[in-house]
Amino acid sequence: MRSPGAQDNVSVSQGMRAMFYMMEPSETAFQTVEEVPDYVKKATPFFIFLILLELVISWILKGKPSGRLDDALTSISAGVVSRLPSLFFRSLEVTSYIYIWENYRLLELPWDSTWTWYFTFLGVDFGYYWFHRMAHEINIFWAAHQAHHSSEDYNLSTALRQSVLQQYSSWVFYCPLALFIPPSVFAVHIQFNLLYQFWIHTEIIRTLGPLEVILNTPSHHRVHHGRNRYCIDKNYAGTLIIWDRIFGTFEAENEQVIYGLTHPIGTFEPFNVQFHHLLYIWTTFWTTPGFCHKFSVLFKGPGWGPGKPRLGLSEEIPEVTGQEVPFSSSASQLLKIYTVLQFAVMLAFYEETFANTAVLSQVTLLLRIFFFILTLTSIGFLLDQRSKAATMETFRCLLFLTLHRFGHLKPLIPSLSFAFEIFFSVCIAFWGVRSITQLTSGSWKKP
């Protein structure tokens, strides 16, 4: 999307304002896609700052944190997984857009026009509304979106719970804009539209007064994330809630919202979170008789079944009582601290990988990605208290030492190398003993 040096042109002020769509057209006008800064990457420090700020404010106002550690780790893990494809290729949304622009555009609006800027703002938001709506109303699209709704908490970390598959369905809805809007303008607004949706994932902000009429707000988006019957298939807006008001999908927040999927998945394992609904579709597709019914399994709503309306029956959605207890890990606090520590180590190498992709060999890049995936899976197993978690963690720590020894994982601070070797050696010994104990006792065979 951009040239390597472009992100350095984004100031701290711009990075923060981009998250609230408070940028001037004149400061975000670029002639080519390569000039467009990576606003999302530049916003990473603000993500962290606002998550911590929300945590502090929640402690002050409610006397408790805004979420749970296990759920937050799973949400951030989903965000980590969703970014991995970008190590190899540009976003499909932008790639497909550029292709249509270069081959099929009908006219060319000026890239430096204020009118083009605002028209693109409306066009991208309108496209997002219809993508988001279809992501809830078409089962195969829902499989590429449901990961975002799987959290039973609602806080800023939930915003990071993104699907690795979503961009492979969303690109279609922006293609009409490519007939006349330059890719550089689109590349700016597709990022701003995403960034705006970060801060609305919070319970701290109750209402924004008159702005509730026009903008998508935390209150409106809380409804969207609810599994109460009145919340289902409502408030699809990205930035402007007017689309929901126009097309009849608006619902105001009027009772306690219970968050998550209508049928909670009960796991913190990141790839189960990402792909469990695809497995459900696969099973349902092959067990449903008739070509027409099989077609409906894919392209009607997630709640559809033979003899039911396209989006299913609302009375089949489980009632909520307000007493629902979110799925939580039974792991000890010490083990949770351990998972946070291992996650932090992984995240440091993850960010360093993105910063230095151009100078890393393909072998190193692939080995690192495998390590990242294994780390997130192992953390999920530990939080789920799976019987094979100790064995997986033993192998993961051994893999780290191997990659470290052969130079595929080098800490930014060279003096930490010895500390890492000691720490991971101790981890191998601990988890290795646990694995042997489980193997000899027979508990390893349990799920």
Swiss-Prot record:
Protein topology in the membrane: Multi-pass membrane protein
GO biological process: ether lipid metabolic process; membrane lipid metabolic process; triglyceride biosynthetic process
Positions occupied by motif Histidine box-2: 145-149
Cofactor dependency: Fe cation
Reactions accelerated catalytically: 1-O-(1,2-saturated-alkyl)-sn-glycerol + (6R)-L-erythro-5,6,7,8-tetrahydrobiopterin + O2 = a 1-(1-hydroxyalkyl)-sn-glycerol + (6R)-L-erythro-6,7-dihydrobiopterin + H2O
Keyword Iron: yes
Motif mapping: Histidine box-1: 132-136
Catalytic activity, EC: 1.14.16.5
GO MF entries: glyceryl-ether monooxygenase activity; iron ion binding
Pfam families: AGMP_C (PF24858), FA_hydroxylase (PF04116)
Keywords, alphabetical: Endoplasmic reticulum, Iron, Lipid metabolism, Membrane, Oxidoreductase, Transmembrane, Transmembrane helix
Tissue expression pattern: Highly expressed in lever and small intestine.
UniProt family annotation: Belongs to the sterol desaturase family. TMEM195 subfamily.
Record's function text: Glyceryl-ether monooxygenase that cleaves the O-alkyl bond of ether lipids. Ether lipids are essential components of brain membranes.
This protein's name: Alkylglycerol monooxygenase
Phylogenetic lineage: Eukaryota, Metazoa, Chordata, Craniata, Vertebrata
Name of encoding gene: Agmo
